[in-house]
Structure formats: C-alpha cells, structure tokens
Amino acid sequence: MKTLYSLRRFYPVETLFNGTLALAGRDQETTGFAWWAGNARLINLSGKLLGAHVAHAGLIVFWAGAMNLFEVAHFVPEKPMYEQGLILLPHLATLGWGVGPGGEVIDTFPYFVSGVLHLISSAVLGFGGIYHALLGPETLEESFPFFGYVWKDRNKMTTILGIHLILLGIGAFLLVFKALYFGGVYDTWAPGGGDVRKITNLTLSPSVIFGYLLKSPFGGEGWIVSVDDLEDIIGGHVWLGSICIFGGIWHILTKPFAWARRALVWSGEAYLSYSLGALAVFGFIACCFVWFNNTAYPSEFYGPTGPEASQAQAFTFLVRDQRLGANVGSAQGPTGLGKYLMRSPTGEVIFGGETMRFWDLRAPWLEPLRGPNGLDLSRLKKDIQPWQERRSAEYMTHAPLGSLNSVGGVATEINAVNYVSPRSWLATSHFVLGFFLFVGHLWHAGRARAAAAGFEKGIDRDFEPVLSMTPLN
C-alpha cells in the first residue's frame, strides 16, 4: 500500500518514551527519523537531547580554548594583531586584557589563561555530554521533573525561555562589571591614541540608548552600528541586561496570554525555527557591526574599516602633497571637484576624490583635525601630528578589501603582501552563517506550521533507491 503520510505524522511531539525499549529514540522504527536526521531522533528523549546539547557546548568551548592557545603560540608582539590573522586575541584585547597605551600588547599571559580555562571547561562539558548521551536517563520527566518538559507545555516553555533570558542578562552585566570594576576595557578614543580605562560615567539616559534604535540605518545615521563611545556601549549593556533579567523573571512567573497561545506554534520544531531566526538576525547585525564600527571593534586590533582605510589614503596623500607645496584647500581634481578637500551636500568640508562617499567616517586619528564645519583647513596646515601620519599610512595599506571591485579609491596592488583583514573574515563569516541560519529558519518554520496544520505529507518513500540496496549490517 502506498504510504500517503510520512511516519513522522504518527509520532506526535508529546509522546514520552519511557525507556523500556532498548533502542527507543535511536532507530527509524521508533522515531520516524533515520540516523542522518541527527537530533530529530531525540525530540522526545529529553535526557539524550540534553546530552547532545551539552556535548555540542563542549565542542564549541574546546574550539575556543584550542584556537585561543594556537593564536597565543603564533603571536608576534611586534606586529599588529590584524596582520597575523587573529580573530580571538583581538576580542580579549578589546576587553582590556594584556594591552596598554595605543593597543600595544604588554602581556600575553592573560590570553594563555583564557585558552587553558576554556580547555578545562570543555573537558567538563564533554564528560557531561557523554554521560547524558550514553549513561544518563533517556527522559528527565520521571526522575527530575524540574528539568523535564513536554514541547506542548506552554507554561514550561516560557519558564525555560525566562531562564535563558536571565542567563543572557547576566552575560551582559559581566561586560558591565569588567568595564566598571575589573580593570576596564580598551577605549580606542582615549587621548593620545587609545588606552585601557575604567568606564565611570555610564550613559543611562533612555532617550540616548533607545535613540540608536530609532535612527535610520543609512549613511551618517547608521542605526545602533553608529555607536562611537564606550559610555553608550556599556550603558546599553546595563539596559539590555536589566531588560533580559526582568523579562526572564516575567516569563518564569507568568503563563502565555491567550493571544500568544493562539498566534504561535507550540512544538519543538517551531522553537527551533524561532531560535534560528533570532540567530540569523544576530549574525546580520554582527556583520554590520564588525565591518563599520571601530569603537566596539578597535582598528588597533581588527585593522581599519573599509571607509577608514579609504579616508586614511586621502589623508596620507594630502599630507604628502601639502609638504611638496600643493595648496590643498584649492587644488582641483580631474572632475572639477576639490582634489584633496571638497564640501559635502550639507556644507561640511570633507576629503575629496573617490573617498567622498565615506565622508561620515569617524576615527580617533582624524577627529582632532575637525572643526565645527568638518575638516578644519588651518588644523590640516598646522596641527597634523606624526602619530596621525603613521597610523593613517598603516591603515591605508591594510584595507579590509579582499577582492572587491569597488574599493573606495584605495590603491590596490596585485603583487602586494598576502593580507586578509580580520574584519573581512568576521563580517563575511557572520553574514554567510546568518544567511544559512535564516534559510534554516524558513525551512523549519514551514515544516512546523505544516505539522501544526496537519498537512505535512513527507516524501513518498516507495521508489527511494535506498530501499533496493543491501542493508548495511
């Protein structure tokens, strides 16, 4: 007889396997999922699913520790971090560990400690994962009801949501405490070219913090990605941590309202799709943050942003040609606009040439040369400091371009040093992974809605090639 529905339809999500079957939850007969469907076999085995999640956390933390130690072992203190392909040490340096004025690394021991702590933690998580996957109870509902759940139990699900929110809030406050009490964090805007400092004067004004959310995402505005001082960043974490913690308490104490019970799909696959959607949003925001923001991701560690490298080149050649006698205030370029300086449509004096599109860049090496109406001609003639020239020349030659076609005027050389900026790596990886997560969100949301509506057909298995093959065993 032709099977119209996939086996999965007959294993509704609320079924509890009680562990009496030797292989319950391990084979296609008991779960409706083949071995390659991974954790789908464990949908109703809360104990085994716990093991899978703990083991996964162990793998993540093991990677963090091992990669951390690998970067420490290969680190050359005399070279900038962004020239060495590092993606973890810049994060530790940004948190103020091991660095001094100007972002110079003065002690690598904290990085070593971080790697070892992550390795030790991964061993604990790995043991827990193996224990719960192989030895622990298959389901937690009978023995440990607090940790047990049924996917349809809306009250339990929002309690779990609340616990997660509280943990996220604590994570946000860890950064706040580091910045306020435990040595401070690295501030690229500190006078004289950046330094580690404690953040004393937090921005807690809701109009400022939530004003970022109301900004346009386009040039000159830049939504939350435009944040450019640490007081706002740390103050934002106070707000976010508080909202997460109070929201978590709220979700633990309350049951979902009727409109939420009706509007949402309440199944394991639905929760998976919600989570993937959230992670996709995180990935896209992280991509924009690491690409454009040089405060949360200081250029001393991650290399310049694209706009920063382009503006640095304009500045470098302005300095050179001014020394050679050019009048940078009035020289015309090939388009009839100013060669070195021009006016933006709103009247500010900005760098001329192709870098004009990046007129809204803010960077610590450039801001001292601005006046009330943009770049100040008298400061450009008299006040340029050697450290600004050095830094802009360094950033000009380390643009995070990869092989883009439109490079904002940055001189590109096919025989140049083999260099890929960590900004390119981090922005691209987070965009690509965010996109994959978004596709996964659509896929699982569609399946969850179909299952809830009762028309999940599944694939017709009658003519599948594997049915005519010899069994593996």
Curated annotation (Swiss-Prot):
Cellular component aspect of the GO annotation: chloroplast thylakoid membrane; photosystem II
One example of the protein's molecular function in GO is:
metal ion binding
Q: Which SUPFAM superfamilies match?
A: Photosystem II antenna protein-like
Q: Which Gene3D superfamilies match?
A: photosystem ii from thermosynechococcus elongatus (1.10.10.670)
Q: Which Pfam families match?
A: PSII
Keyword entries, A-Z: Acetylation, Chlorophyll, Chloroplast, Chromophore, Manganese, Membrane, Metal-binding, Phosphoprotein, Photosynthesis, Photosystem II, Plastid, Thylakoid, Transmembrane, Transmembrane helix
Q: Where in the cell is it found?
A: Plastid, Chloroplast thylakoid membrane
At what positions is N-acetylthreonine found?
Answer: T15
Residues engaged in binding [CaMn4O5] cluster: E367
Q: Propeptide positions, renumbered to this chain?
A: 1-14
GO BP, one example?
photosynthetic electron transport in photosystem II
Q: Which domain of life is it from?
A: Eukaryota
**Which residues get modified to Phosphothreonine?**
T15
Write out the transmembrane intervals.
Answer: 69-93, 134-155, 178-200, 255-275, 291-312, 447-471
The annotation note on the cofactor reads: Binds multiple chlorophylls and provides some of the ligands for the Ca-4Mn-5O cluster of the oxygen-evolving complex. It may also provide a ligand for a Cl- that is required for oxygen evolution. PSII binds additional chlorophylls, carotenoids and specific lipids.
Q: How does it assemble?
A: PSII is composed of 1 copy each of membrane proteins PsbA, PsbB, PsbC, PsbD, PsbE, PsbF, PsbH, PsbI, PsbJ, PsbK, PsbL, PsbM, PsbT, PsbX, PsbY, PsbZ, Psb30/Ycf12, at least 3 peripheral proteins of the oxygen-evolving complex and a large number of cofactors. It forms dimeric complexes.
Q: Which family does it belong to?
A: Belongs to the PsbB/PsbC family. PsbC subfamily.
The entry's function note states: One of the components of the core complex of photosystem II (PSII). It binds chlorophyll and helps catalyze the primary light-induced photochemical processes of PSII. PSII is a light-driven water:plastoquinone oxidoreductase, using light energy to abstract electrons from H(2)O, generating O(2) and a proton gradient subsequently used for ATP formation.
- Protein name per its UniProtKB record: Photosystem II CP43 reaction center protein
Q: Give the classification, highest ranks.
A: Eukaryota, Viridiplantae, Streptophyta, Embryophyta, Tracheophyta
